[in-house]
Amino acid sequence: MCGRFSLTTEEQQLNEFFRLAGGTEPYVPRYNGAPTQNLAVITAMEPHRIQYFRWGLVPFWSKEFPRSTPVINARAESLNEKPMFRQAFRKRRCLIPADGFYEWTRSEKKQPFRFVMTGETPFAMAGLWDEWSHEPGKHIYSFAIITTSPNKLMEPIHNRMPVILLKENYDEWLSGDNEYNLSEMLRPFPDNGMKVYKVSDRVNSVNSDGPELIRPLVNQDLFSNE
């Protein structure tokens, strides 16, 4: 599962990394991106600009806007089986820029951890997007993050992780049409390319935001609750 992530990279560095010419809205760093928020994505429609879509996929065929828990993740193993994801996987894929994501231990006291690249560079999670417009004058663009089995770094903390794409696959992920090649991209990211550290439990609240959320705790004994 992936239920919270950050994008705090300076705008110039972000534009250079993803070969962007800007965004549809002013760029604002997000230290605690959460479901139902409008967050940065890159699509084949605008491959050189950031767009802002709602996190929680609403399929185009839905007769009404869902009021229940948003669908924030899509399992890589069943994209072609689930009606909610099948067409989006074939035609509406996206990159979700990030520089870290959060996950919590499954113990009684839930300790948040932040996962980043070893070089603390930006990266792209694999996503699906859709457009819902069943109410007059109302168009909602939304997305979900694709998840896969965990790598060795992630496994002690959670049994799923977001699909992190290799940079050389970004263009094909957005506009490719070979389903075998696309499916092969949906693998756990190499654990030696990532690192993890404890962060404050302030990140537990979706209302919290700010640079203090991504600072490492002093105690980095990873599996101590103290």
Residue ranges: model-predicted function:
Residues 1-226:
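Short linear sequence motif anchored by a di-proline
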